[in-house]
Amino acid sequence: MGKGGNQGEGAAEREVSVPTFSWEEIQKHNLRTDRWLVIDRKVYNITKWSIQHPGGQRVIGHYAGEDATDAFRAFHPDLEFVGKFLKPLLIGELAPEEPSQDHGKNSKITEDFRALRKTAEDMNLFKTNHVFFLLLLAHIIALESIAWFTVFYFGNGWISTLITAFVLATSQAQAGWLQHDYGHLSVYRKPKWNHLVHKFVIGHLKGASANWWNHRHFQHHAKPNIFHKDPDVNMLHVFVLGEWQPIEYGKKKLKYLPYNHQHEYFFLIGPPLLIPMYFQYQIIMTMIVHKNWVDLAWAISYYIRFFITYIPFYGILGALLFLNFIRFLESHWFVWVTQMNHIVMEIDQEAYRDWFSSQLTATCNVEQSFFNDWFSGHLNFQIEHHLFPTMPRHNLHKIAPLVKSLCAKHGIEYQEKPLLRALLDIIRSLKKSGKLWLDAYLHK
């Protein structure tokens, strides 16, 4: 019935009952070939559309058969715009007698968290200070300039080369935190501007891929520390994490490596090799295999700029070695910072928690200081960042006291540590998991 329908026809259309579904029925549709999810009690069939999902089909697929309301709000700053894509996918609603939450999730925590989000919006905590991000970009470009001037003025001796490498590694680490801001759509109101600048920062300043990052990182945020859903805990049999995985490996007599020594070999193959070996290879292969030609062009522009800048000082082979040494230094920085908030927390199979509880279970904070903020790209406020991923990082400290209060109200632990302890806890966690594996391997 179009706009030309008469009043009687419109009334008849409104009287048509909307299909309703129980959670039992919805939860059956959690397969790769059959996906339903719920947002604000409305049921959507995303089976075919998930392939077109800008964030990737896996991240949205992880919520198949579940309520995705809070995840939907967390990832999308412009709800009115993305809501247009949902309308054709609507197939019904939750039955009136059904609770809004699936799997017995805590409705009171969810209600309080949504009230907290409304408070954050009323406090304008999702509003960006653009000068802040311009200064971040300026200091990255300044570091790049200082690095070039050092080798230009002092020559390519060992001391000047080491200084230049450390300055460039610092620039790369800071560019990594900055691309993270744009990737989360936390800078500009319009997603398209965030996407454009994201490609510039991660592509031209770092030589990486925006699509690759989106595909991995959004899954991590959607289901942090959940095996088979969070790619950040897929260690390719190199490490065993948490309590469940090492025991399972031990029971099955899986011994790809001596995991009881993983807290020792972590120093050899974790921080040194993640970026220069694994990520660098994976990023290039992903862009080629998935034909991400725009991302590849941005990445190539980085390598062209780097080699034009440093081949005159080191030659082709020397510049290539220099690049990988910078990646080696940056990798240490990246691994220690990114793992201190997650690897020490609960890592397990899907437990179907509410959004607030799932993020608090998987994340912890590091104490605030000017250095900690800069060193970690404000990921020392990992809890707040995970709860509100589109909130500009300069506002995370403002919402932290309210998050702490909500945790106290519901008896949820809010973990915050000094930086050194957070770093050392990585090793303690690996050692603990290694012991669990050895015990299960020998005795179960």
Swiss-Prot record:
One of its GO terms (molecular function) is stearoyl-CoA 9-desaturase activity. Pathway: Lipid metabolism; polyunsaturated fatty acid biosynthesis. Residues 153-157, 286-305 are lumenal. The chain crosses the membrane at residues 132-152, 158-178, 265-285, 306-326. Signal peptide: none annotated. It comes from Pongo abelii. The gene is FADS2. One of its GO terms (cellular component) is endoplasmic reticulum membrane. This is Acyl-CoA 6-desaturase. Its EC number is 1.14.19.3. The protein sequence includes a number of characteristic features of microsomal fatty acid desaturases including the three histidine boxes HXXXH, HXXHH, and QXXHH (these domains may contain the active site and/or be involved in metal ion binding), and the N-terminal cytochrome b5 domain containing the heme-binding motif, HPGG, similar to that of other fatty acid desaturases. Belongs to the fatty acid desaturase type 1 family. The keyword Lyase does not apply. It is a multi-pass membrane protein. It is an enzyme of class 1 (oxidoreductase). Residues 1-131, 179-264, 327-444 are cytoplasmic. It catalyses: (9Z,12Z)-octadecadienoyl-CoA + 2 Fe(II)-[cytochrome b5] + O2 + 2 H(+) = (6Z,9Z,12Z)-octadecatrienoyl-CoA + 2 Fe(III)-[cytochrome b5] + 2 H2O; (9Z,12Z,15Z)-octadecatrienoyl-CoA + 2 Fe(II)-[cytochrome b5] + O2 + 2 H(+) = (6Z,9Z,12Z,15Z)-octadecatetraenoyl-CoA + 2 Fe(III)-[cytochrome b5] + 2 H2O; (9Z,12Z,15Z,18Z,21Z)-tetracosapentaenoyl-CoA + 2 Fe(II)-[cytochrome b5] + O2 + 2 H(+) = (6Z,9Z,12Z,15Z,18Z,21Z)-tetracosahexaenoyl-CoA + 2 Fe(III)-[cytochrome b5] + 2 H2O; (11E)-octadecenoyl-CoA + 2 Fe(II)-[cytochrome b5] + O2 + 2 H(+) = (6Z,11E)-octadecadienoyl-CoA + 2 Fe(III)-[cytochrome b5] + 2 H2O.
